[in-house]
Amino acid sequence: MEAKISNRIPGTTIEMGMEKPMTGAAASAYGRIIVMSGVASSELGQQIAEYLGTPLGSYTRTIFPNENIFIRLNESVRGQDVYVIQSMCAPLHENIFEMLIMIDTLKRDSAGRINVVIPYLPYARSDKKDQPRVGIAARMLANIIETVGADRYMTIDLHAGQIQGFFNIPGDALTAFHLTSDYVKLKNIPDLTVCSTDLGFAKKARNWAEKLGTPLAIIEKRRTGNDSRSEALSMIGDVRDRNVLLVDDEVLTGGSAVNAIKLLQSEGARDIYFVFTHAILARDATDKLAACGLKEIITTNTFPIPQDKRLPNMTVLSVAPLLGEVIRRAHEGRSVGELFNE
């Protein structure tokens, strides 16, 4: 993808993708695969397209002086199997609305099937009515995506698995566990203990421990405010004189992570590795992690990470091969579950 002018300047136009036709795609009931990348996911979208051996679908995106978004397809998608890749980073609501306009545009051009690929699904913490007079934004977002015209969805490592039930359309709730755990396993870290950041993540942390053949420790913590603030209380398990792999699904402001790391250090842990799927890294999260003395930070590109937030000890694994293979299998009508059993 090549952006001619910055997408944040009202009154400007950018060209997305390439117009040459795809070749070599497997046939399906929905025609050929077309990958359309939102502006926020240009790098990931290009990687997925390259994995599939196809150019990105071409469209023109204009932001008018009143900040209205206008999208025009530069090629016909009639009857085709279209995959809209959109990362939900800042500006979040602009990116959500861009995705919705894209879906509507594809629907009105008679696309055969419209698949939304949202590597990081926003509002995942708003999955239940746990306080008086609050909404359930995750359910609302699922309803909007369906109503606009999406036929299928894909996402990675949902914060709450029950969000799958908010969608009435078929979808694939994927995991980056195999990608990240395979990377860690190849490192052959000696004297390793896997540690969960909290009780809620303990089940997934156990999967890590079983795959790596290590002991499991769990940090018990108590929330002191909203989800961006927490306090680590105690350690379940022994990490003294052990290398520790701290596992979580996402890092927002880094508060929970810093508390967990400090507790591990106070309990006598040696080198600490920190692995998580979604690197949101809001506010000063990067500075907090940089000051913690971590051996290595391992994450993925489900959430675009700018260069100024990529620390020297940070390894970013691409989810493009995972998403690309799932897209191929969905297009060909093959099992996605088999991918994780191979």
Name each region found by the language model.
Residues 1-342:
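PRPP-associated nucleotide enzymes
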